[in-house]
């Protein structure tokens, strides 16, 4: 019998981010094989508990994106099954995927975030929830799925029509936020360290799903060419958010920075507990800036999960125990 550690790479699933998850998972699996692990790739389905029991992994590498791999569901299952796994636990995952709940925890801790409102989809047919321009997005999705900027040019300033609702047809409740002009920044955190700041410059002016995952659609500038005090603040806020939410392993914090407002123009948009691991992904890119290649990064994530007591859910910072 092999003495290699057995890593199950969990990927796919049925969320809107399935294809990206499959791509992440395949790259991770190949890297972990190069790192010397025995690797099994598992496509998430309704029989996943049975498949995990049969596989008998030493640890699961969670390469899922969206529900149920990013919202605490699969984390809770693996907790019940006493299976070690990478990335954040149940509580941090469930909070971070809910953008409005995340605000309620981070804003009182002096982490600036755009303050919007929850809106029922049907109400959009009669009036705008906020003055234009504003951003409309699902409450519980990642990868910029369903995110749109509603400005004066949208429908000639008139309310959204029913035939324009397709991006949000599967979401009864949406989040509306004031649009923050300026630049798109992102920071990866690994463990207790913020890695770097990347500026994202989409060719079409908006960092949507297509811009994120289509080669050549977005220019990544890493490290970002921004004032040192902005980079320091973004990295400090990212690490603080990671710790307050109780994240472990890698996370990624996304920001908008109004460069005309200086330090006061930096706003955290969301914390992603399952950042992508594709060739275009930001965590591997920032790790590379620090001299950590892709194989080494995947090994670090696995070894952290094996070393920590991930069999008991990570508690949120500030709680006892």
Swiss-Prot record:
InterPro entries: ATP-grasp (IPR011761), ATP_grasp_subdomain_1 (IPR013815), D-Ala_lig_Van_CS (IPR000291), D_ala_D_ala (IPR005905), Dala_Dala_lig_C (IPR011095), Dala_Dala_lig_N (IPR011127), PreATP-grasp_dom_sf (IPR016185)
Keywords attached to this entry: ATP-binding, Cell shape, Cell wall biogenesis/degradation, Cytoplasm, Ligase, Magnesium, Manganese, Metal-binding, Nucleotide-binding, Peptidoglycan synthesis
Known EC number: 6.3.2.4
GO molecular function: ATP binding; D-alanine-D-alanine ligase activity; metal ion binding
Entry superkingdom: Bacteria
Pathway(s) of this molecule: Cell wall biogenesis; peptidoglycan biosynthesis
Chain sites annotated for binding Mg(2+) 2: 270, 272
One Pfam family cited in the UniProt record for this chain: Dala_Dala_lig_C
Annotated ranges, domain ATP-grasp: 103-303
Cofactor: record remark: Binds 2 magnesium or manganese ions per subunit.
Keyword Amino-acid biosynthesis: no
Gene3D superfamilies in the cross-refs: 3.40.50.20, ATP-grasp fold, A domain, ATP-grasp fold, B domain
Catalyzed reactions per annotation: 2 D-alanine + ATP = D-alanyl-D-alanine + ADP + phosphate + H(+)
Residues reported to bind ATP: 129-186
Subcellular location, record wording: Cytoplasm
PANTHER family: D-ALANINE--D-ALANINE LIGASE, D-ALANINE--D-ALANINE LIGASE B
Function field: Cell wall formation.
Protein name per UniProt: D-alanine--D-alanine ligase
Source organism (scientific name): Zymomonas mobilis subsp. mobilis (strain ATCC 31821 / ZM4 / CP4)
